[in-house]
């Protein structure tokens, strides 16, 4: 499953262009730029399922590191600092991973 079913190519490209430089990823700006923050709960769940590569029901640190590559093959991996900041922002219960409800709250936040 690809994001084409949820997001527009132009929005994905704009969002990725905004965080090409190492250390420049900001999840709030990215979710807004790609249009995910304005999507329905069902569409957000679809996005979560795409990012949850191992289908564990959670997005773990390794999946976050490769987050941008879900949107476009060849996109850069997040740095360790970006990955940890992203995880901290979304992991509201402190279990070291992001569940679907935490993901939805982070997108709408």
Curated annotation (Swiss-Prot):
Entry GO MF terms: calcium ion binding
Segments forming domain EF-hand: 39-74, 78-109
PROSITE patterns: EF_HAND_1 (PS00018), EF_HAND_2 (PS50222)
Binding site for Ca(2+) 1: 52, 54, 56, 58, 60, 63
One term under GO cellular component: cytoplasm
UniProt keyword Repeat present: yes
SUPFAM superfamilies, per the entry: EF-hand (SSF47473)
Name the record gives this protein: Parvalbumin beta
Organism whose genome encodes this protein: Scomber scombrus (Atlantic mackerel)
Keywords for this protein: Acetylation, Allergen, Calcium, Metal-binding, Muscle protein, Repeat
Classification via CDD domains: EFh_parvalbumin_beta
Modified residues (N-acetylalanine): 2
Binding site for Ca(2+) 2: 91, 93, 95, 97, 102
Any Pfam family: EF-hand_7
Post-translational modification: The N-terminus is blocked.
Function: In muscle, parvalbumin is thought to be involved in relaxation after contraction. It binds two calcium ions.
Gene name for this UniProt entry: pvalb
Protein family (similarity comment): Belongs to the parvalbumin family.
Alphabetical list of InterPro entries matching this protein: EF-hand-dom_pair, EF_Hand_1_Ca_BS, EF_hand_dom, Parvalbumin
